From Swiss-Prot:
It comes from Oryza sativa subsp. japonica. Transmembrane segments: none annotated. One of its GO terms (biological process) is response to light stimulus. May catalyze the synthesis of indole-3-acetic acid (IAA)-amino acid conjugates, providing a mechanism for the plant to cope with the presence of excess auxin. The gene is GH3.11. This is Probable indole-3-acetic acid-amido synthetase GH3.11. The keyword Chloroplast does not apply. Belongs to the IAA-amido conjugating enzyme family.
Amino acid sequence: MDDHNLDYKGSGALEELEMLTVNAKEAQELILTKILERNQATEYLSKFMNGSTNISAFKRHVPVVTYDKVHPYILRIATGEESSILCGEYILELLRSSGTSRGEPRLMPSILKDLDRRTYLYSLIMPIMNKYISGLGEGKAMYLLFVKAETLTDSGIPVRSVLTSYYKSPHFLHRKHDLYNNYTSPDEVILCPDSQQSMYCQLLCGLVERQHVLRIGAVFASAFLRSISFLEQHWRDLVNDIRIGQLNSSITSPACRLAMLNFLALPNPELADQVEAICSCGSWKGILGRLWPNVKYIEAVLTGTMAQYIPMLEFYGGGAIPFVCTMYASSESYFGVNLSPLCSPADVSYTILPNMAYFEFIPLEDGLRLTDHEEVIENDKLVSLVDVKVGCYYELVVTTFSGLYRYRVGDVLQVTGFYNRAPQFKFICRRNVILSIDSDKTNEEDLHNSVTTAKKILENQNYLLLEYTSYTDISTVPGHYVLFWEIKSTHDERPAPLDAQLLESCCAAVEESLDYVYRRCRAHDRSIGPLEIRLVEAGAFDALMDLLVSHGSSINQYKTPRCIESSLALKLLNSKVIACFFSPQDPECGM
């Protein structure tokens, strides 16, 4: 990583990637050695290593930990103690995780060199894409990118999301505007902390540049679809701005208004007529290809529970625009890239880059039987990066330069193969998103698979499931699972009635698809009541996102929580319920 910028490096980047993956074992040993050398004097490592930088000693003595063990050190730094209690370098900022998997945001330490590592990974994306799609340098990218307002700790350390950190960094703002980093959105609009004003302006830029746009997307599919939903609601205002050459008065950000002058220098009634004709045609099926006729692909994270959004993307894309998932990253570290970006989202595997951090893996020996959040993991159970086995499931553990040592990220991965000596992983689920009433334990993937089975019943009746989440309602005896569903018609003509029998059959289908323990508790032990679907009004999940973003989540990193833990979020969703349906029968339990 000698050249830490976003300049397009072409085949040179791929040659470097080849060398890196061929020498994955050596790269990992070098990374860990450097981490130990730079951080050997920290209070945290000194407790276990006594100043040693020996790799074997690290593996014997440094424990595997969850956030609860790291949090006290981060709080001490946040309130004014030296970074050296955790990290040998100055902690530049604390990165706020999305906070939607466990309720409260987690704060991850970050140092200046972390930006180099993130930029290195970003610099690989376009060389990889150019292997599969030609002509990407001949147009622009409409990437809908957002920042979140940051806060300061008592000691003055910025607290921000990892993406806000990157978009505000010199690495992004001082990038050379070459052919492959040519975005429709001005930086000033991306950096607007008001996501509604930013979204409006970014969509307006994309419409003005519609003939030049070759790539569209956002970080997560949820953010992209939220933007398209926003476009459905506001296209008339956007068309009017284009027609008269003036920005809507609702945009009050001075930076946004100044940046948009170049896009609305003159009235453009011809373009306004084109966009109006497309947006007013009735059905929005396939509208992305009509609004941006030269688009070659949609880029967003569509793995894990983001796969929920594929049907809606297919609806808006008309089934004609490929989906691309390019990278795997989190607030803790950036991890890897997808070397086969045009594969089906269901087949996406990420090649771990061995120069990002030091990676270890907790084997999940019983398939997806997840280790308990508080379970003590014996050090000798961990497997190194190059020693994982194809087909096996693991929980990811990282050691970083910035002060995370053998930290359980919480992601469950399955090894799908190797690229040279670097393993390739499929993202399966987050460890701690579960529903449980009795002896049942339903994880995120179990829930996703069950909902996927049930939603086919809706699709056969010309409905799409837009969003869902869940919680365990123990106000009843026995307690039961509750699913909140938001549904949209996909048919130009009048769809089949959305009656009780249809939703009850969905309840039954979810239950039949859940595991044996759940079905036994329901049908035999009677320790779980019938599953309930609460249908919510249109826009309920947008309101949920607004609530969670207002409480610290980043709009870029936001993912709909698949299990609601916040009482405020639960109250909001219950206020949006328009009908309730229960499973009409016991599931089969084979007893």
